[in-house]
Regions:
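Low-complexity, glycine/proline-biased repetitive segments and flexible coils/loops
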Residues: 1-14, 23-299
Length: 299
């Protein structure tokens, strides 16, 4: 900007003129984009990787004067059909210019596990996605097949940036996806149910893992919840989204009911699992990068 001599003199005399800081200790919160839920009774998307130094074991970083780059990860796009969900993209805080170093990278959340093995297995990411499902066998009550959720904290960071997804389930007369992992805890598993004829046996979908709270902006906000799994059976429950913005999974049948719910914007939360091309999965929520400078400045 341009200031007159009078405005500069006045600001300096009042102590309000900006001063250069040679270096400063910066606290950060870097959350990647969340993964989308999978299609067709799929698993919920995993939350984006969650890395912070504020009131956490990780140390603040010291920055000197210079240019820095910030990349905020996008959420994975929604899915219709039987395929896996899409992963979120990474959020990055790094030095620009000739320094060119990356200081903090949070990994995108995993896309939910879809239908039919081997694609039904959950995927790995900042937080892992819920395991998917595959079509049921004959009616009747019998053992259910578990489909593993994906691993969180992939690649590994210390402290951990995320948690695992819950397993999906193929029951004799119904399938359901597992919940995506959240920043606070793992995604919930799908659970087999015993029902009267003609349903016999189905499955309730897993809930998304809880997010994690931070007060880096001055008030406590929970972010990065996992997405809930979807369910096939008409009398079974879809998975709730994890606290902090995770999307709920789709429930069948669908007249008048919504598709899988998207993760909340700027929380890096996972999207809920979908049902079919008419009722797609929920998209993952975009991430966020927050920097807290000395005093009360928040970027």
């Amino acid at each position: 900007g341009v200031w007159s001599m009078q405005s500069q003199f006045s600001a300096k005399s009042q102590g309000t003129w900006p001063r250069l800081i040679a270096s400063a200790s910066i606290n950060y919160l870097v959350i990647a984009g969340g993964g989308s839920g999978a299609g067709e009774y799929g698993g919920g998307g995993g939350a984006g990787g969650y890395r912070t130094s504020y009131c956490a074991p990780a140390s603040a970083i010291t920055l000197s004067e210079g240019a820095y780059t910030i990349t905020v990860g996008g959420g994975g796009a929604a899915i219709s059909g039987t395929t896996d969900g899409n992963a979120g993209t990474n959020s990055i805080f790094g030095a620009g210019g000739s320094e060119g170093s990356t200081m903090i990278t949070s990994t995108g959340g995993a896309g939910g596990g879809g239908t039919n093995p081997p694609g039904a297995f959950g995927n790995d990411g900042g937080s892992g996605s819920g395991g998917g499902s595959y079509f049921p066998g004959p009616y009747g009550f019998g053992p259910a097949s578990r489909i593993a959720g994906g691993s969180g904290n992939t690649p590994s960071t210390s402290p951990s940036q995320g948690n695992d997804g819950g397993f999906g389930l193929k029951a004799p007369n119904g399938t359901a996806g597992g919940g995506g992992g959240g920043a606070g805890c793992a995604g919930g598993p799908a659970v087999q149910t015993s029902l009267p004829a003609p349903q016999y046996s189905g499955a309730n979908a897993g809930a998304g893992g809880a997010g994690r709270a931070s007060s880096i902006t001055g008030s406590s906000v929970t972010r990065a919840g996992g997405g809930g799994g979807a369910t096939e059976g008409p009398v079974n429950a879809s998975g709730a989204g994890g606290s902090g913005g995770g999307g709920r999974g789709k429930h069948n049948p669908g007249p008048g009911t919504p598709p899988g719910v998207a993760g909340t914007d700027n929380t890096g939360s996972g999207g809920g699992g979908g049902f079919n091309s008419s009722f797609p999965s929920g998209a993952g929520g975009p991430g966020v990068v927050i920097l807290r400078m000395p005093g009360t400045s928040v970027i």
